[in-house]
Amino acid sequence: MNTTANPSNIIVGLSGGVDSSVTAALLKQQGYQVRGVFMQNWEDDDNDEYCSIKQDSFDAIAVADIIGIDIDIVNFAAQYKDKVFAYFLQEYSAGRTPNPDVLCNAEIKFKCFLDYAVGQGADTIATGHYARKEVRNGVHYLLKGLDRNKDQSYFLYRLKPFQLERAIFPLGGLEKPEVRRLAAEFKLPTAAKKDSTGICFIGERPFREFLQKYLPTDNGKMVTPEGKTVGEHVGLMFYTLGQRKGLGIGGAGEPWFVAAKDLTKNELIVVQGHDHPLLYTRSLVMNDLSFTLPERPKAGRYTCKTRYRMADAPCELRYLDDETAELVFDEPQWAVTPGQSAVLYDGDICLGGGIIQTTDKPVIITR
């Protein structure tokens, strides 16, 4: 297990899922003083059919009872709405596709929760993320999780050094089947609970239905790059680059994909074929840079992920100014999407990254 300097008092973020449950059980088994915290980060729909917050809190309490630890329920809903959800809506309004889970980690789980835990006298917080941490010459390095199918370092790239120093990831060296086996061995009620999917505050509800509650929609044309109308979209914010499903374009030939959004004309630009050149990018510009180490990485060669679970892509990092950098890829990358995060790696070390603003293709048109 990766720890800080001999922490004794650890507060675990218990989400009601199997990963955080096993995290708490392992730490208790290893002799640490462990407490749990269930974070209530969403309130708007906590009585509707799609919201799992109540069940998740019941599961977290049941896990704490079996393990034999205390648990607090702490409400961060106001902070979440201000720091995460407002940004989520702002980005969709601008035609981009944000990743709120990245911001939730940086602003809620490793800021609000960390501040709360320190205020309660904790030395360290622990979460069920599949990531690792190593301390080398006093520097805390964020590394990919051993289970490459579950590695979540991509979602943690905005953590600062002071946050990493206070965090541990007990599952980082385990694979998911082993975590399930341990949950059954500990007789935890979450052992067979399915993993959560989608954005945390949306849950299993239809995305379009959810977003329409908060943002106005405006139907428009689906057009080819040559300007031919081939269909109608139901609102640009409901589509993301590279999307194939749900376009409703008939006819023969290869499948259609979203290639760009023209915000001025309210048009969705679509192309036929997965290998259409407009879907491929050789470079991107990212801003709002954030790095996990005390010094930002030097310009040079690294690998990058522009979306979760993609294979690392070799690239060249070039700084444009203090807050902006360009990445130039060795090979064209498919469906690089503004609003998503570009995350840099040096081998297994997660260095940080930024928010994708533009690419060498006109994917968000605002002229």
From Swiss-Prot:
Cystines in this chain: 104-200
Annotated localization: Cytoplasm
UniProt GO MF annotations: ATP binding; tRNA binding; tRNA-uridine 2-sulfurtransferase activity
Role according to the record: Catalyzes the 2-thiolation of uridine at the wobble position (U34) of tRNA, leading to the formation of s(2)U34.
Protein name: tRNA-specific 2-thiouridylase MnmA
Site (Interaction with tRNA): 129, 340
GO terms under biological process: tRNA wobble position uridine thiolation
UniProt superkingdom: Bacteria
Amino acids binding ATP: 13-20, 39, 128
CDD domains cross-referenced by the UniProt entry: MnmA_TRMU-like
UniProt key word Iron-sulfur: no
Active site: 104, 200
